[in-house]
From Swiss-Prot:
This is Mediator of RNA polymerase II transcription subunit 22. The gene is med22. One of its GO terms (biological process) is positive regulation of transcription initiation by RNA polymerase II. Belongs to the Mediator complex subunit 22 family. The keyword Signal does not apply.
Length: 136
């Protein structure tokens, strides 16, 4: 899979998840506002309050569904992350065995050189004497 198609797929998934989050958030906020508008109880009789209680229950159920939708989005993101669903589409680079062996040899040489340098430096610091202060 090419890098461009992977990027398009990633953007599409991101946009889908963002729109799900936006829709759920909008539903929660609008239903909460509806509940607040209905909840104003200024001298209402019980025949008016009863249908309003039912409306509040319906809005509450809608809010719960929206929260469940947000939890589902969270689960999807975790699933993509845990199963590497996003990274399985990364373009792969094919290495041949000679290339890997060359890299291994180069890293081994570098490691050996660094070990030699670290062994030489302490010996050099041991042979140098600290400057002395003369009494004059």
């Amino acid at each position: 899979m090419s890098s461009d198609s992977f990027q398009r797929q990633l953007v599409q998934r991101t946009n889908t998840l963002n729109s799900s989050i936006d829709n759920a958030t909008l539903t929660i906020l609008s239903r909460f506002q509806d509940i607040l508008d209905i909840a104003i109880n200024e001298g209402k009789d019980k025949y008016t309050v009863a249908p309003e209680v039912y409306q509040i229950e319906c809005h509450t159920v809608s809010m719960v569904r929206a929260v469940e939708q947000l939890l589902d989005v969270s689960r999807q993101i975790k699933s993509y992350w845990l199963t590497n669903s996003l990274s399985t589409s990364f373009p792969t680079v094919d290495y041949s065995e000679p290339d890997l062996e060359k890299v291994k040899r180069t890293l081994t040489k570098l490691q050996n050189h660094l070990l030699e340098v670290s062994l030489i430096e302490p010996e050099a610091s041991e042979t140098t004497e600290a400057p002395t202060v003369s009494d004059t």
